Amino acid sequence: MNAQLVKNQLSECFYKSLFVNSEISIHPINIISSVKSIIGIDLDINHSSLIDYCINYTNSFEYVDSFGVLDNLTAPPAVSFASLEESLINKDMKESLNNVAALLKVSDGKHIIEFLLEFSIKYRSPAFQLVWCIYKMNLFVDHKNLNESIIFCIKYITKNDISPFSNADIKKKFKFDKYVFSDKSFKDVLIYYSIYNEQLIRYSKIKEYIDINVSFFDFSDPRKHTKTKDEQLKYGRRWISLFIKDLDESKLNPDLIFVLDLFRSALKFSDGKHDKIIWTMLNNYLKYYFK
């Protein structure tokens, strides 16, 4: 596939998605980020149908003019990330935007998105999934839509509930190979695994909060048996790209695309260490998905 054409098409979808107001689980930003990564596995595999699906899905949503602007705001004279954290806890979008406007004068917008990712993980906001997609897509588009991306993240963080943070929460070492698969938690675990292994500026704090959050999941699997296919071990992540290419278009849906990309990312960071475990989880998911 033409790499530049793909980038242009997905970049346009990404920009449009920043002005879509929908539920987190079906938001097009999830699909755009996933399609970008699946196609990136091997550009020699023709995914024109997947691109068309992504474009049509994005265009199926209504757009709002804006969630807010960072121009002409009343920026406080002294501001810190602590100020932004307080305004986010209070669900005060206007004050959060004021704080961001001030922070942008002294801080890189990329750092602000990382902070928003850290915040959403620390306070267990369901928006962390979208913020993570925003982080990855901004790398893809060379941070061309930073302001819109920040506003988008703040909007979704302030409109969703968060959980109180406590240092007293039990911390559990994130032992991915011991995770007991659960329909309710596997998506969060796979996202955490990817974030855990990403080279982030705020890595130490983010890692600490992930360790706290995974304490709520079951990591007691002795993992005596794995179920893999020979072609999965042979082709690695490329198997996922080929699988979705050969899938009948009628069976494509946002959740399947999103989940396949979560497993792709896990395989990337596993680098052979946990591959059989990841393939077993994926095969279990596909078994119940297509039953």
Each language-model region and where it sits:
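Mature, well-folded catalytic/scaffold domains that follow N-terminal targeting or propeptide regions
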Residues: 1-291
